[in-house]
């Protein structure tokens, strides 16, 4: 290819004359050649050295924790119910026994004993129950005493005499200053009601035995 770009030397010149390049052959073979020089950016007028764009372009700021919110947390509006599917937390509330629920069974037990117990004993029990009602209505009894009395009445109504007597003793030990004036009557009422129940049970058993003894055998006729 070198011979296409070089013309033979001038015969009239010396042997060491340099060859002459043909510009026309160069343009025909390769076309216009691009200049390898790049454009230079003019220097800034203020005279400060120019920094490449890659060094001056700021990157994204570092991510830090979000700033605290200046707004206080808003409470839910009044009257708004809980979210669906979530039940409100229920706190156990200590229920207080009702005075009528305790006194009514005791008075009924006293009425059952009348006619089977001496009048003096029944009158003393009635007076003690009146003191119990007075102190209860006056707010002089604590919640533990009221709750134990409710349990005592349940055991008494169910004819569980030993359990009722155990509750009576626990009240005398733990709350003697509250119950000493009327608990004696409750204790006597438990004993009288227990005795009456045992007597009634014995009478029923005796009556059943007598009825069985006097029962006529089917098909058997006594001689007239």
Swiss-Prot record:
Residues 58-76 have a biased composition (Pro residues). Residues 201-215 have a biased composition (Basic and acidic residues). GO terms for cellular component: cilium; cytoplasm; cytosol; intercellular bridge; intracellular membrane-bounded organelle; microtubule cytoskeleton; nucleoplasm; nucleus. The keyword Cell wall biogenesis/degradation does not apply. The modification Phosphoserine is found at residues 48, 57, 75. One of its GO terms (biological process) is apoptotic process. InterPro entries: SRA1/Sec31, Steroid_recept_RNA_1. It comes from the Eukaryota. GO terms for molecular function: steroid receptor RNA activator RNA binding; transcription coactivator activity. Keywords: Activator, Apoptosis, Cytoplasm, Nucleus, Phosphoprotein, Receptor, Ribonucleoprotein, Transcription, Transcription regulation. Highly expressed in liver and skeletal muscle and to a lesser extent in brain. Also expressed in both normal and tumorigenic breast epithelial cell lines. Significantly up-regulated in human tumors of the breast, ovary, and uterus. It is found in: Nucleus; Cytoplasm. Residues 1-90, 201-224 are annotated as: Disordered. SRA1 RNA exists in a ribonucleoprotein complex containing NCOA1. The RNA also forms a complex with PUS1 and RARG in the nucleus. Interacts with AR. Functional RNA which acts as a transcriptional coactivator that selectively enhances steroid receptor-mediated transactivation ligand-independently through a mechanism involving the modulating N-terminal domain (AF-1) of steroid receptors. Also mediates transcriptional coactivation of steroid receptors ligand-dependently through the steroid-binding domain (AF-2). Enhances cellular proliferation and differentiation and promotes apoptosis in vivo. May play a role in tumorigenesis. Appears to be the first example of a new class of functional RNAs also able to encode a protein. PANTHER family: STEROID RECEPTOR RNA ACTIVATOR 1. Belongs to the SRA1 family. This is Steroid receptor RNA activator 1. It comes from Homo sapiens. The lineage of its organism: Eukaryota, Metazoa, Chordata, Craniata, Vertebrata. The gene is SRA1.
């Amino acid at each position: 290819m070198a011979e296409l770009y070089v013309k033979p030397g001038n015969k009239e010149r010396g042997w060491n004359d340099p060859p002459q390049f043909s510009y026309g052959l160069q343009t025909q073979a390769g076309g216009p050649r691009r200049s390898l020089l790049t454009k230079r950016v003019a220097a800034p007028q203020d005279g400060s050295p120019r920094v490449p764009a890659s060094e001056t372009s700021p990157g994204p700021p570092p991510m830090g924790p979000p700033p605290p919110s200046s707004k206080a947390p808003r409470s839910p509006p009044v009257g708004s119910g809980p979210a669906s599917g979530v039940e409100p937390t229920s706190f156990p509330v200590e229920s207080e026994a009702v005075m009528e629920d305790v006194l009514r069974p005791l008075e009924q037990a006293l009425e059952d004993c009348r006619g089977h117990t001496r009048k003096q004993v029944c009158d003393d029990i009635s007076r003690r129950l009146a003191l119990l009602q007075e102190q209860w209505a006056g707010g002089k009894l604590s919640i533990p005493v009221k709750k134990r009395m409710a349990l005592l009445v349940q055991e008494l109504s169910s004819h569980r005499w030993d359990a009722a007597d155990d509750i009576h003793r626990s009240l005398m030990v733990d709350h003697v200053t509250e119950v000493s004036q009327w608990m004696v009557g409750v204790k006597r009422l438990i004993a009288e009601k227990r005795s009456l129940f045992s007597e009634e049970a014995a009478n029923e058993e005796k009556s059943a035995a007598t009825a069985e003894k006097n029962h006529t055998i089917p098909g058997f006729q006594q001689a007239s």
